[in-house]
Amino acid sequence: MEPSSKKLTGRLMLAVGGAVLGSLQFGYNTGVINAPQKVIEEFYNQTWLHRYGESISPATLTTLWSLSVAIFSVGGMIGSFSVGLFVNRFGRRNSMLMMNLLAFISAVLMGFSKLGKSFEMLILGRFIIGVYCGLTTGFVPMYVGEVSPTALRGALGTLHQLGIVVGILIAQVFGLDSIMGNEELWPLLLSVIFIPALLQCVLLPFCPESPRFLLINRNEENRAKSVLKKLRGTADVTRDLQEMKEESRQMMREKKVTILELFRSAAYRQPILIAVVLQLSQQLSGINAVFYYSTSIFEKAGVQQPVYATIGSGIVNTAFTVVSLFVVERAGRRTLHLIGLAGMAGCAVLMTIALALLEQLPWMSYLSIVAIFGFVAFFEVGPGPIPWFIVAELFSQGPRPAAIAVAGFSNWTSNFIVGMCFQYVEQLCGPYVFIIFTVLLVLFFIFTYFKVPETKGRTFDEIASGFRQGGASQSDKTPEELFHPLGADSQV
């Protein structure tokens, strides 16, 4: 392997850093709605009282609040499904740049919702920033995967998740009552998203377009070669160009890959199934139930200062994402995902025990904090970062946009289901709500063990070739045999 293949150049750092500002936006808007729940609900009540002359009913308030949380995911579903419309027409970098218009519109709507006495403005703003984040969850892993050398693809791909968790942590800190999570400043808390949008608009014009897009989609070999030299910090980019040209030749032999074709073709059916299930394993693990409703969970657990415990979980979240960043290229994607799922299942059982015995044993509140922190830590070992970038690894340039759209749509749909339903399910099941997530985590562990290949150290074309070979005779092979060409020997 060439020394340049592991070189982290200034231009590569700029490209990845500029892109993951979008990831930070996603994380911020996921976490920002949690801490100021009570003051925003009071705004809803006052607005209702001003309009209709009576206080809002508890059932209506619960529905409006759940909608405010979950409409973000509806926007994300629409945005994620639209990824392919933009990246193939405008390119990866320009698509990220254009989408900041949505962030500015959303910031205005949410920032002026209190002044306009309109909770509809807030909900619409949440929907629009959801569309932005849905697009971002497709654009960023795709762009980062395509500009990164093979040896750094996993580590740099994890930066998308790091951007998300840093965004969540910033939202939790800004959401403190003493900072912006109060009656006067909550509109600013929701609209501060214009700052990273502005910063991304400044940085992205200096970032290169994806060399794979330039060569394979646009057939601009000279531009692709020039970009590669800057990204790799070397004049010899022969190996990268050869690999891209081989992928381009393979793409020309294939017909245009639509979303339906992903499910019809034997060569794509297995990787798209893996991509979708890995996305579901991220969202249906219960992690967003913890993020969206962590403050109220800590309150129920008897924690005196629940918002600080929530911030503690955000710090754990960030720290273990950094750990994953350094081990993903050594341990491999599959191994880390399995460890994460198993650890989360164990912590979910602990959480259930702690919440169930809280009234009899007050000290169980401490166990609930340990369980939540452990749950978050194991999430960031595998199920947090890996599903985002492994989708881009499982597909070659042709089917990649369609595959990322399908995987992203699956992610956001399950995100919406959890965001909309968790409060109701929690009211129904009480302390046993996390048993549901435990069962799902065990099922995802079994699927990952038998079906998910190791992609560490493999080029995009090598991975795609493994699936093409497997697709030709799937019925005659066990899962282990099917994925042997993809590097089962490199698993830890």
Curated annotation (Swiss-Prot):
In this entry, the parts of the chain located on the Extracellular side of the membrane are: 34-66, 113-120, 177-185, 294-306, 356-365, 423-429
Cytoplasmic topological domain ranges are: 1-11, 88-90, 145-155, 207-271, 329-334, 389-401
Report if keyword Metal-binding is assigned.
no
**Primary place of residence?**
membrane
| N-acetylmethionine modifications at | M1
Glycan attachment sites: N45
Q: Which residues carry this modification: Phosphothreonine?
A: T478
- Membrane topology note: Multi-pass membrane protein
* Modification comment: Phosphorylation at Ser-226 by PKC promotes glucose uptake by increasing cell membrane localization.
Residue ranges annotated as transmembrane are 12-33, 67-87, 91-112, 121-144, 156-176, 186-206, 272-293, 307-328, 335-355, 366-388, 402-422, 430-450
DNA-binding found in the keyword field? no
Molecular function (GO) terms for this protein are: D-glucose transmembrane transporter activity; dehydroascorbic acid transmembrane transporter activity; fucose transmembrane transporter activity; identical protein binding; long-chain fatty acid transmembrane transporter activity
| One CC-aspect GO term | glucose transporter complex
Q: Where in the cell is it found?
A: Cell membrane; Photoreceptor inner segment
What are the record keywords, sorted?
Acetylation, Cell membrane, Glycoprotein, Membrane, Phosphoprotein, Sugar transport, Transmembrane, Transmembrane helix, Transport
Q: Which family does it belong to?
A: Belongs to the major facilitator superfamily. Sugar transporter (TC 2.A.1.1) family. Glucose transporter subfamily.
- The name on file for this protein is Solute carrier family 2, facilitated glucose transporter member 1
